[in-house]
Regions:
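Conserved pre-motif I regulatory segment
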Residues: 2-42
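Walker A/P-loop NTP-binding motif
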Residues: 34-35, 47-63, 80-82
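Pre-Walker A (Motif I) flank of P-loop NTPase domains
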Residues: 35-41, 62-63, 115-116, 174
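Hydrophobic positions in the central parallel beta-sheet of the AAA+
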Residues: 41, 66, 118-120, 142
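Conserved nucleic-acid-binding Ia/Ib motif block in the N-terminal RecA-like helicase ATPase lobe
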Residues: 65, 71-119
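Conserved helicase/translocase P-loop NTPase motor core
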Residues: 114-130
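SF2 helicase catalytic motif II
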Residues: 130-174
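Single conserved hydrophobic/aromatic residue that forms the stacking wall/gate
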Residues: 175-187
Length: 187
């Protein structure tokens, strides 16, 4: 695994995202992700949680899989990542609303190594064809975005979230929650 000193991380932050400095504990979180450590992040809205998986995805080999509950949020994240790159294939999402041609294009971009971030709803991630596809892909890490929804909306919300753990051995949770006690309910 590559080592990234603080100076290099700051250089890459500027190069990829145009920021001169990290917010709060972003750098420590990013370093943990780069070192392959499971990481649970508590940050307020606007705290920069997304960058905590976006920058490592850009720096690591393979594609980062981001599990998100809302298609609109996935689309916003993909659109934002594409503004930072000249390659529209840098980020994609896969969901049930896509036609076969669009799914094939996304999968092709992933297999060619163009895609660094691939977003799924939990229902899409747990579909057998997507599980089979991901077995062919070098995955850099997994992130669960907006995991607080599991706690706030109850464990009956999106039962597919319970099926993620058997599919993924190590899950990186990047979440927005207001109280640490929810960690126990989410896990």
């Amino acid at each position: 695994m590559k080592q990234f000193d603080s100076s290099l991380l700051h250089d890459k932050l500027k190069e990829y995202f145009g920021f001169s400095s990290f917010k709060g504990n972003q750098e420590a979180v990013i370093r943990n992700v780069l070192e392959g450590k499971d990481t649970f992040v508590l940050m307020p809205t606007g705290g920069g949680k997304s960058l905590c998986y976006q920058l490592p995805a850009m720096l690591m080999d393979g594609v980062a899989i981001v599990i998100s509950p809302l298609i609109a949020l996935m689309k916003n994240q993909v659109d934002a990542m594409r503004t930072y790159s000249n390659d529209a294939g840098i980020a994609h999402f896969l969901n049930s609303s896509m036609n076969k041609s669009a799914v094939a294009q996304v999968r092709n971009d992933v297999l060619e190594g163009r895609t660094k971030l691939l977003y799924f709803a939990p229902e899409s991630l747990t579909k057998e064809d997507n599980v089979a596809f991901l077995r062919k892909v070098k995955v850099s890490f997994y992130a669960i975005d907006e995991a607080h929804c599991i706690s706030e909306w109850g464990h009956d919300f999106r039962p597919e979230y319970r099926r993620i753990r058997p599919i993924i051995n190590e899950i990186l949770s990047l979440i927005h929650i207001s109280e640490p006690t929810r960690l126990r309910r989410i896990s």
